[in-house]
């Protein structure tokens, strides 16, 4: 695992969290209960404190960083999509940040909000509860619908369930040379489907 102390500060990871072995956690990082940290995520707490609250997920290739005397926070059940960058910002409870989005210093994403994939949220942005944000720079285009929030909850639950599945069934191995006959397919734990 990539855990590094920095100036006597050691990352704190709740025993029920899952941190992929290729992820890197440096210094002042606090990871809560049931959190999922994906492959190649970088949580660099060498300036400001990084807090990932209970039930949140930080997916593959995400970056968290911030400035001194500030906290970068992902609230409870927050959902941070692949490749997103969070820098000195606050992501509200139950919010989703889409793939490859960038959230800058001092920005606050409101509870139950969704930031569309590939969006750029400017420094100092102050969002409200349940906004759909999109664009570069991102702006609020409408409220998040009940169906969208339900879809978000199902996706977040898949990652919360993945924590336990990874603790039990994920291990390093060697690849097969060819696909076996009748190879099974993996199943999720909810009926969530891709958004179209």
Curated annotation (Swiss-Prot):
PANTHER family linked: DYNACTIN SUBUNIT P25, GAMMA CARBONIC ANHYDRASE-LIKE 1, MITOCHONDRIAL-RELATED
GO biological process, one term: carnitine metabolic process
Keywords recorded for this protein, A-Z: Repeat, Transferase
Functional note: Overproduction of CaiE stimulates the activity of CaiB and CaiD.
Listed name of the protein: Carnitine operon protein CaiE
Species for this entry: Escherichia fergusonii (strain ATCC 35469 / DSM 13698 / CCUG 18766 / IAM 14443 / JCM 21226 / LMG 7866 / NBRC 102419 / NCTC 12128 / CDC 0568-73)
GO molecular function terms attached to this record: transferase activity
Pathway where it operates: Amine and polyamine metabolism; carnitine metabolism
Gene designation: caiE
Domain of life: Bacteria
Pfam families cross-referenced by the UniProt entry: Hexapep
Residues spanning the membrane: none
Region (Disordered) location: 176-196
Keyword Transferase annotated: yes
Protein family per UniProt: Belongs to the transferase hexapeptide repeat family.
